[in-house]
Curated annotation (Swiss-Prot):
Its cofactor is Mg(2+). GO terms for biological process: alcohol biosynthetic process; isoprenoid biosynthetic process; mycotoxin biosynthetic process. GO terms for molecular function: metal ion binding; prenyltransferase activity. The gene is terC. Keywords: Magnesium, Metal-binding, Transferase. Belongs to the FPP/GGPP synthase family. Mg(2+) 2 binds at D111, D115. This is Prenyltransferase terC. Its EC number is 2.5.1.-. It comes from Tolypocladium album. Pathway: Secondary metabolite biosynthesis. The keyword Metal-binding applies. Mg(2+) 1 binds at D111, D115.
């Protein structure tokens, strides 16, 4: 494995990361939003802020996002699985947390650009402040930096990080192809469609959590099953909040962005398999017309689809109660009517 000693080029990581997006977004309740001028999207509006506000802003898009979420976002999980790591190996402790932050936040930065999102945790998205070009470049710079640090300090962790990035981007690539080509590229029915969606989610989201276990265990797979299941729960939870949580929509400034973008989610797959809602969903995903999307949102919020999603979410959480509590995503979802 002599390649571990070589530096990873910025260009290669940029190519890997260009399609990545990990965040979970929502649109406004009317499924519409004002269009930002192209110049604002490209260059941001930080320069237009007052000097006082500009001086208070974080120095780069990554630090801005960290200021919203908090640094060392995975610390509670690290302490749960290895409570003595900070004391026994402080260098590894810091490296693991920096790797997890870098992957999580860098992919969110790119995701918000690709989804043209305006808000995250009730704050403007980074690319609206710093511009899309600087935001994407900073994401790649952060990833490249943490990869090179890992390869220098703990080569085994660097190898795990590179493999995880490949799997995450493979999952995201599947999702983006389905979004680009529509249902002609997702020709699955019934249980097969759910399995295909879960496979994508396992790569895109499950890998992020599996990576944490691999880093803590120096490449060991002892936590793979547990953290893969938790990754599925996290994906499912965010898919459901995207449709069913008013609180989540407020924090994101929008509702049902997956639907509007033509991106598949678990509720959408369930609705596609329901005879009473399948045609409505197919029409909305094909046309993207406002009236069709509004009708599809009503179908997603219908009792059969909502109940099926809530059952799946409850089943996915079994045995993961402590991890769910530590992860701390607590936005409420509307009860069935």
């Amino acid at each position: 494995m002599d390649w571990l000693g070589n530096r990873v080029s910025v260009g290669n990581i940029a190519l890997l990361a260009i399609g990545a997006s990990m965040g979970f977004i929502a649109k406004t309740s009317t499924l519409s939003k004002p269009e930002a001028p192209n110049t604002v999207q490209q260059y941001g509006y930080c320069k237009k802020l007052s000097s006082e506000k500009r001086n208070q802003a974080a120095g780069c898009p990554y630090e801005y996002l960290v200021s919203i979420y908090g640094r060392h976002h995975f610390e509670s999980l690290v302490k749960e699985f290895n409570p003595l790591l900070k004391q026994e190996d402080p260098v590894k402790y810091d490296l693991v947390l920096e790797i997890m932050d870098a992957v999580h936040f860098a992919l969110i930065l790119v995701d918000d650009i690709s989804d043209d999102s305006y808000q995250r945790k009730n704050q403007p998205t980074a690319h609206l402040i710093y511009g899309a070009s600087e935001t994407a470049n900073r994401a790649y710079l952060v990833l490249t930096g943490v990869i090179n640090r890992a390869l220098r300090e703990r080569p085994v962790l660097g190898a795990e990080l590179l493999k995880a990035l490949e799997d995450i981007l493979q999952g995201q690539d599947l999702s983006l192809v389905w979004r680009r080509d529509g249902l002609k590229s997702f020709q699955y029915q019934g249980d097969e469609s759910i399995a295909a969606y879960k496979n994508m989610a396992s790569l895109k989201t499950g890998t992020l959590f599996v990576l944490l276990g691999r880093l803590l265990n120096d490449g060991g797979n002892e936590l793979d099953d547990l953290l893969s299941r938790f990754g599925w729960f996290a994906q499912l939870q965010n898919d459901c909040k995207n449709i069913y949580s008013a609180e989540y929509a407020t924090n994101k400034g929008a509702v049902a962005e997956d639907l509007r973008n033509g991106e598949l989610s678990y509720p959408i797959v369930i609705a596609l398999n329901d005879n009473s809602t399948s045609r409505v969903m197919e029409r909305a995903l094909a046309s993207h017309a406002e009236a069709d999307v509004e009708e599809a949102l009503q179908a997603l919020q219908s009792k059969p689809v909502r109940d099926a999603c809530m059952r799946a979410l409850q089943q996915a959480s079994v045995g993961l109660e402590k991890l769910v509590l530590l992860w701390g995503r607590r936005e409420k979802m509307q009860a069935g009517s």
